[in-house]
From Swiss-Prot:
Keyword Ribonucleoprotein found: no
UniProt region (Disordered), positions on chain: 48-104
Organism: Arabidopsis thaliana
Primary role: Elicitor of plant defense.
Prosegment residue ranges: 1-81
Alphabetical keyword list: Plant defense
Family: Belongs to the brassicaceae elicitor peptide family.
GO biological process, one term: innate immune response
Biased composition (Acidic residues): 63-74
Annotated positions for site Required for ligand-receptor interaction: 98
Official protein name in the record: Elicitor peptide 6
């Protein structure tokens, strides 16, 4: 008897957690977009744990830091993720002054 009651309570608790989750998704479209972007970045392997999630993406805060004599601007939130992605891209190879292509 107690096992069935415990299973029933656990099932009710799981149902309530699911309802709370879906309720928060439906009432907060910004959180849906944020979770979508986080999922995409995570799938691409570009999510960084050093960048804290922003509470409002409309006004990102800027913090200036000095690293070995150079000034950098660190942004928080969505724009910081985009700039981090852009910074991680490899540089294009330098132009070669070698032999030009051949015309047939």
């Amino acid at each position: 008897m107690e096992v069935n009651g415990e299973e029933e309570r656990r099932s009710r608790r799981e149902d309530e957690e699911k309802e709370d989750y879906y309720y928060s998704l439906l009432n907060s479209p910004c959180s849906v977009c944020n979770k979508f972007v986080q999922a995409i970045l995570k799938c691409l392997g570009l999510e960084s744990s050093s960048i804290p999630p922003s509470s409002s993406s409309s006004s990102p805060s800027l913090v200036e830091e000095e690293d070995s004599g150079t000034e950098t601007v660190e942004e928080t939130g969505f724009m910081a993720r985009i700039t981090a992605v852009l910074r991680r891209r490899p540089r294009p190879p330098p132009y070669s002054s070698g032999r030009p292509g051949q015309n047939n």
